[in-house]
């Protein structure tokens, strides 16, 4: 089709250029400051196998986008550099000439395999769009770009014969819309298209009870049942464009803000179970998306608890039968322990370390492979979700603390355990109780307490209280319980890291009696910690007390009670509660745990959204299921 220059095209291109530097900061997948040398051997850049390696092809595309951003930056030495402009222009033609015309169906171009579709359906259209716009006053790439988008993005949800949804469609739709602008359509005409409407309905981000999108507790899901924030983070840079094209209310930015607040930090750190299938716990762009304020944040239905304060960031994920505890793909299958068992805090003043996807991290239980490598491959040609065979989780939060209690069985990891985590002002206490291997083991198990990067820090020589980037690990024994083993240090020379671990006997693991616990504390206040953990005799009750007893967490699973003396708050939850709107808390279930705290049911002061009958309390809340009282 002949390219028609209509006003909406010019208006969008101006907006794109005016905001490119800001939106590029928000882009997660990128080459931030492109410096790679152009080549004259037909591969675009030196030392690149552009036409035979999917990895190299992706790097080339991101480098071209990065160079386009530098070309647009008035403060960059390459601003409107003519040699660079010609290199970008030539690169677009080289790519186009190497591609099959029309696009292949259910296969990838250049002899690459289907899992490499992402480069051709998402990154390549973005690259052509970006280069076409930044060079518009130097070289005319409009017809070339329109033609490529015609073949590789015939619809915002269809590329190379494959339909895409959710996060992928959010990315694909923007260059598709640009292609329509090149063809002379207006913003309004494009917005009326059926498949564009599908994407716009997605990015309205209405709260949903299940499936893709932002749930009522503000957790983001993709692939139906996966807490896959990588898709939301990767798509965020497109939201301002959609609001410009189709109106400022197109994307519900408040719901997006609440969703990101649930999981992120200003340092860019995220629990690895929430971000990416490569096991990463870091996204450099997070600080460019929103300001992450301090507080205790909980996603009660999606089982996410996050704490940010002036000392640390902490985040833990729990499990539920309808939520994937792990998702694998053909290229990523070693991160199940990271997703399922990471229990730690990160110092606000510590260095951000390059992350290793090996399963060695605070909270991970090592059973069959003590080196942390457990391969749980996908069961099909694409991604596969894995669910717990049993899972009950309850969250409880006050102004100063947050707790999570869970019972879970993970068949692929050969584990069943109870997990109790408490965040407080100084750090985190964690206990695994009733740990059981589903299949017999002969070697002792280990729980990773702390990991030390030996690239930048001296190696540990003892295993008492251990410090690694500004975090102190503290050993605890449980009152009325057999003493627990001291920490043991291991060094992994090939990985250049050390671990502090607690050993659990194989005999205990095989019969379901495994126990391990520890605290991770901000280094500067570790000496202030006075956390205790007590088993109440002749019962299943556990009491965790900390901060000079001002924070007390009592667990009589499935019930968890969190008491905050400073704020006079008391929060109660039941892990067996599966309701999503009207929640019931049986009085019989909480009488004993309240008595441990020298309280009774009559001590509880009810807020407006909680009512009481003879046998139960009732809470009306679409966004959470915690019963929050004063006393």
UniProtKB/Swiss-Prot annotation:
Gene3D superfamilies (alphabetical): Baculovirus E66 occlusion-derived virus envelope protein, domain 2, Chondroitin AC/alginate lyase
Lineage top rank: taxon: Viruses
Task performed by this protein: Component of the polyhedra envelope.
Protein source organism: Leucania separata nucleopolyhedrovirus (LsNPV)
CC annotations in GO: membrane; viral envelope; virion membrane
Chief localization: virion
InterPro entries according to UniProt: Baculo_ODV-E66_core (IPR043082), Chondroitin_lyas (IPR008929), Lyase_8_alpha_N (IPR012970), ODV-E66_C_baculovirus (IPR006934)
Localisation: Virion membrane
Name this protein carries in UniProt: Occlusion-derived virus envelope protein E66
Keyword set, alphabetical order: Membrane, Viral envelope protein, Virion
SUPFAM superfamilies in the record: Chondroitin AC/alginate lyase
